[in-house]
A protein has these predicted regions:
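Bacterial N-terminal signal peptides that target proteins for export
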Residues: 1-9
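Polysaccharide-binding surfaces and accessory modules of carbohydrate-active proteins
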Residues: 23-36, 40-214
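Hydrophobic h-region of N-terminal signal peptides that target proteins for export
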Residues: 12-20
């Protein structure tokens, strides 16, 4: 997967094309496709992102080594290895989450296509929606999550990423922006190497006056 394609992949993944069965959801741009499985009672998983595919190609993805099989929103709890998108402490002090798909909704708005994957914890009254919004006439999908604490007592969120996406080893590039007063939005492109890449600033609420990394 190359970050030099026309499709935006920070939290942007393609144009929603609809579910193919009870669990397969294919999102496509003119040049790329994203395949997600979201079967009720199971983990929601990314299965493929790369060159554009059609419905008839899906079985070939599963039969090959191309399928990701990676949770679309991994949380700290039962499985703790690897990077987690969310970590919480419940009112009783337990730090475990075990989210499974409850339902998936797709609908259209004036701005584009929407897909909501609602997940619930198997023990606690905790739910999460992973939302994808495909804007009309673009190659952009924004994605974010909404958290629901349906218990009577508060819980503490220690980590809450807006998105999680796996990147397979390869010739992958990242485009990002930085700057300072009078020279904002300077674009950089760099090849992704092993390890983590962190883009941040410490200016807090005044970050748009100087360095605003993205």
């Amino acid at each position: 997967m190359s970050m030099k394609t026309k499709s935006l992949l920070i939290v942007a993944l393609g144009v929603l094309s609809g579910n193919l069965s009870a669990k397969d959801y294919l999102l496509s741009t003119p040049n790329t496709s994203l395949l997600i499985t979201a079967n009720p009672g199971e983990k929601s998983k990314y299965q493929y992102y790369g060159s554009r595919i059609s419905e008839k190609d899906i079985q070939g993805i599963y039969d090959s080594s191309l399928a990701f099989g990676v949770e679309s929103y991994p949380v700290f709890g039962v499985n703790t290895a690897g990077e987690r998108a969310m970590a919480v402490t419940h009112a009783d002090g337990n730090m475990s989450l075990d989210l499974v798909v409850e339902e998936v909704k797709q609908y259209t708005t004036d701005e584009g296509e929407m897909m909501e994957i609602r997940m619930k914890d198997l023990v606690y009254p905790f739910a999460l929606k992973q939302i994808f919004k495909a804007y009309k006439g673009t190659d952009i999908i924004s994605t974010w999550v909404e958290v629901e604490n349906n218990g009577k007592k508060p819980l503490t969120l220690y980590r809450f990423a807006s998105a999680f996406f796996p990147v397979h080893r390869g010739d992958n590039w990242m485009t990002h922006f930085h700057g300072f007063w009078g020279a904002e939005s300077t674009m950089d492109e760099e090849k992704l190497t092993n390890g983590q890449k962190v883009i941040s600033n410490k200016d807090g609420l005044v970050n748009t006056e100087s360095d605003n990394p993205s």
